């Protein structure tokens, strides 16, 4: 096992992993899972042209609370391409249950782009494991959250970098929430000590950062906490 070099020097004997951290409920749970599995976690977040900074503030809170080797925030403006209500303020965020097929909150190729940054960070950090909070249960219908997509991405990743083609090891893309409902995810996170009051899930928060309570993400979150039988500490 190779030690992981930390952000401020020194070494960490744990194996390194990259965790994509949006600041939402799912990615916070995944960071807790990776920690529990014994990884030294490099959290990776993105300022990608989204409407608000509140999710990045949440990501910073979660990274600090759960403990990471370092937290990298990458600036990349996906809004220049348009095509999503999350990056284009002229496109309204639909209320839960009103979207047909793939909703306008889908950001074109977002997970492919984010995972590719994660792949680059993994190579430089000496990590062979990348974690993402994708789920095919209780989700908004995005094509890049499906298990077949992530399997294909992992296969590509192992053909794509100096580290993987050297034959020393293979890289694994982990989606530990893939087959969990939102309620099951919350139960798991609570058992691992996740403070969901630090997280943010809303697609269309108000100027003060408060969740809208009407978008698909708010609806899924509310239903999850209701099924678990505990109040949402974030008030969403």
UniProtKB/Swiss-Prot annotation:
Q: Name one GO molecular function term.
A: ATP binding
Q: Where does ATP bind?
A: 21-31
Recorded E.C. number(s)? 6.3.4.20
Q: Which UniProt keywords apply?
A: ATP-binding, Ligase, Metal-binding, Nucleotide-binding, Queuosine biosynthesis, Zinc
Binding positions for Zn(2+)? 202, 212, 215, 218
Highest taxon in the source lineage? Bacteria
Q: Which cofactor does it need?
A: Zn(2+)
Free-text remark on how the cofactor is bound: Binds 1 zinc ion per subunit.
Q: Which InterPro entries match?
A: QueC (IPR018317), Rossmann-like_a/b/a_fold (IPR014729)
Metabolic or biological pathway: Purine metabolism; 7-cyano-7-deazaguanine biosynthesis
Tell me any Pfam family this protein matches: QueC
Where does the record locate the signal sequence feature?
Answer: none
Query: Which GO terms are recorded in the biological process aspect for this UniProt protein?
Result: queuosine biosynthetic process
Name the catalysed reactions: 7-carboxy-7-deazaguanine + NH4(+) + ATP = 7-cyano-7-deazaguanine + ADP + phosphate + H2O + H(+)
Q: Which NCBIfam families match?
A: 7-cyano-7-deazaguanine synthase QueC (TIGR00364)
**Family assignment from sequence similarity:** Belongs to the QueC family.
Query: Its biological function?
Result: Catalyzes the ATP-dependent conversion of 7-carboxy-7-deazaguanine (CDG) to 7-cyano-7-deazaguanine (preQ(0)).
Protein's UniProt name: 7-cyano-7-deazaguanine synthase
């Amino acid at each position: 096992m190779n030690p992981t070099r930390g952000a401020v020097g020194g070494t960490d004997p744990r194996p390194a992993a990259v965790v994509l951290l949006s600041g939402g409920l799912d990615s916070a749970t995944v960071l807790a899972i990776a920690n529990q599995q014994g990884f030294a976690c490099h959290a990776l977040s993105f300022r990608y042209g989204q409407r608000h900074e509140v999710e990045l503030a949440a990501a910073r809170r979660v990274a600090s609370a759960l403990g990471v080797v370092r937290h990298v925030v990458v600036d990349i403006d996906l809004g220049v391409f348009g095509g999503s209500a999350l990056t284009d303020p002229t496109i309204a965020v639909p209320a839960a249950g009103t979207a047909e097929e793939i909703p306008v909150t889908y950001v074109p190729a977002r997970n492919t782009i984010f995972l590719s940054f994660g792949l680059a960070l993994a190579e430089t950090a000496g990590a062979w494991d990348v974690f993402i909070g994708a789920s095919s249960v209780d989700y908004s219908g995005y094509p890049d959250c499906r298990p077949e997509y992530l399997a294909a991405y992992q296969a590509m990743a192992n053909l794509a970098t100096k580290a993987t083609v050297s034959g020393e090891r293979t890289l694994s893309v982990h989606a530990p929430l893939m087959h969990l409902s939102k309620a099951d995810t919350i139960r798991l996170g609570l058992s691992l000590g996740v403070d969901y009051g630090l997280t943010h899930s809303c697609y269309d928060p108000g100027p003060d950062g408060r969740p809208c309570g009407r978008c698909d993400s708010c609806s899924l979150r509310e239903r999850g906490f209701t099924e678990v039988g505990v109040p949402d500490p974030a008030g969403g």
